[in-house]
From Swiss-Prot:
N-acetylserine sites (modified residues): S2
GO biological process, one term: heme oxidation
Reactions accelerated catalytically: heme b + 3 reduced [NADPH--hemoprotein reductase] + 3 O2 = biliverdin IXalpha + CO + Fe(2+) + 3 oxidized [NADPH--hemoprotein reductase] + 3 H2O + H(+)
The protein, known as: Heme oxygenase 2
HRM repeats mapped onto the chain: 264-269, 281-286
Modified residues (S-nitrosocysteine): C265, C282
Membrane topology of this protein: Single-pass type IV membrane protein
Amino acid sequence: MSAEVETSEGVDESEKKNSGALEKENQMRMADLSELLKEGTKEAHDRAENTQFVKDFLKGNIKKELFKLATTALYFTYSALEEEMERNKDHPAFAPLYFPMELHRKEALTKDMEYFFGENWEEQVQCPKAAQKYVERIHYIGQNEPELLVAHAYTRYMGDLSGGQVLKKVAQRALKLPSTGEGTQFYLFENVDNAQQFKQLYRARMNALDLNMKTKERIVEEANKAFEYNMQIFNELDQAGSTLARETLEDGFPVHDGKGDMRKCPFYAAEQDKGALEGSSCPFRTAMAVLRKPSLQFILAAGVALAAGLLAWYYM
């Protein structure tokens, strides 16, 4: 009888130890930076999922001019990020995540810029106003709080390795870009043989960083700030769209920009049948004229770049 009691007590004690070990393991896992980022940015993911701009991008509803300008916004963003990563490559809170050969995108983006704009592309482009705020934030973090740089690196590169491949196919199909990669070098990671395995390595390195819980929480907060900067770009896009709509009504635009055969335009043909041609303005030509405004071009570019960044998070 006593032996049975001892055996029972031994089993109970063993179960308690196993339960305690499991609980401790779960606590440690939830304290991992990758898990904290995943849980801590869920709300940002939810907002992104309901963005019409992202849905349209997935459907291939994007024009080549906007894609060119999106590449411009990405170029300035990654130039800032990689400049600060280079500055902090020996910092203990970032050094294990320094993978220039595998991850850096500036060189690839330079090739894309040359493809879209020509050799003198640097003379033709400027950083969008809203994107400039994000660039300034990255520089501030790199120079003053480098322990938070991981928030921006993880958000961008892990997303690019995941959803970026989907975006590449969408862009090539919608814009009829060469299958050999011209114009989409940004999405090509030549030195990463297996994206899934590399992401696992990156997360393991990130989780092994010697950071206290307070710093980890600040990193999660910084990752959410990155999303907020992107959402501000959308707000600017909406405001610019309303402003330009008013400008269109006030200023007007030349009929078909004075080019092409008006009789071949479906809009004018329909209006002529209704006897309502005089005073009408083709919406297609109006839109094209609006898109030629530099201010809108760069705002739309930032919007497209934002969509790419947000969409990439879905596939992480």
